[in-house]
């Protein structure tokens, strides 16, 4: 490995004797240095506080030719003699030996050994790829080390990723310590797999699972289709803009839940703990974050375990104002439920795509019959894990834990939160149509008029006050939910926030999203009149300034009613006949009118309200089995009313099922998909991705949606 640099005061750069490159303090962010040398004047300038705030624990030396008192935070004083240069080098070497986390450290050392391998993978460190022009290009594009680090588990030096031995075990123990879990398991095929591991380890046919209707489809797959458990659904909120909200407060009432049990499994209604598992989204896709303490205090005594699906959060414990939402920071006792937390590290933490982790916090119920031991969980883990893991994915999870250790993690997320606040302020200052989804006024003062440091430290500035017009969510209790400060959520015109009704003109968010992509900016998702941008410590002022500028530019196009060919050339050129001579406002109006004609915002809301849930007539596992046996037929969604769904159906994103296998098509769900069908035909170029329903072109050239139902 290449030696790291030494950072030094500019006046010392030329005086330091080292084989290492010496860089000035102002020319580094300290991620590439192994030691720091400062002057006495530097020690009084704030550099020591800056170094402490990094959380990197760098050795710091004070250079002085005179006797000085050793300041706090300084390792030693040096004056330039040879022995002291050796001490500096020794400290730098020791830092290099210790700053990497366990698995990644072992991996880099193993790669540097350059072993000759006759084991898989067959590309043999990339050599196979380099024997063909396409392969050579592939190799050069990704770089040498990714191929050298892709190796077989035939060599045991790196430990075992399936039974958790060696440095692999050390890495997961380290992550558990950082994230305050009892055990942590690294998962290399996403939180979809992580959720299935947990649900397969805990649930069997006949078990009751308390089920957030907002849950990602992977929870349906693991808990309902694979395990065959019986769900008790919790209704959830949608607001008129299309944002995904949280579970209604009344759903956390014990008597209410016992009545729901009487409807599906009356024999279990009076059991002390009727639910083997509750599955709750700790944070929704659209940034509604739960208070974990409230969840456990209200329903925890009814559940053996609670799985907090934290795919869209995971960083809450590193942000002080979000700490109450972290299940892993709670003090639990023998009467509380066991806790599982699944996190999509690749979403907003530092991980390659597909990296996920399972945190297990249940030592407080060890010895009880409901306790899930490691061996049982690992059995489920191995059901879903590959025997040929991609080691760079595992290493990324290891490095992610190291990044979040101690002050480093807190600093990085504090900077992210403050940058997000500054960006919201910039949008409020420059834009008239697009509004950040935050309380417009707090304690009689405009949100943006508070200092950023105040906004970043008090959850009041992100809280959903029950009944407040600005957010439009119903059924919330005080202090139940707040807006994730690391989700930059914007609303677009089309909804009157005071009434929740449609306005005469609107700008559907998908049109804005297309414009941004045309101009090199990729939002995370959009829906109806809402759009989401994920914020992570990777962001920069320049990047977010570009976004704000592009939002303002699009607003100008709206005001000018620019030609569609100019604003969305890709869509226009693909469908020139359909959109000939169209202007931007004309397209916005047509799409908005489509939403209004189907009342899509209310359909979307109704799908997740209990009174509008599709009727359940069959266990989801049984319906899925019938589908696999071919006991189904493909029918038009228009004709599916009263038929039993064989597949779950959803738009993606967000990946939340609207109808579950074993439920009956009809009502709001059917009308919602018919609205989507109308949009596919009326507005080509803006079709959503649909799963569980199929678009087929009929003889008249129109696209129709079909779905499988039981015969």
Question: Where are the model-predicted features located?
Answer:
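A short linear hydrophobic-aromatic micro-motif
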Residues: 184-185, 342, 520-524
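Non-catalytic terminal extensions of PLP-dependent enzymes
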Residues: 2-4, 12-19, 28-40, 45, ...
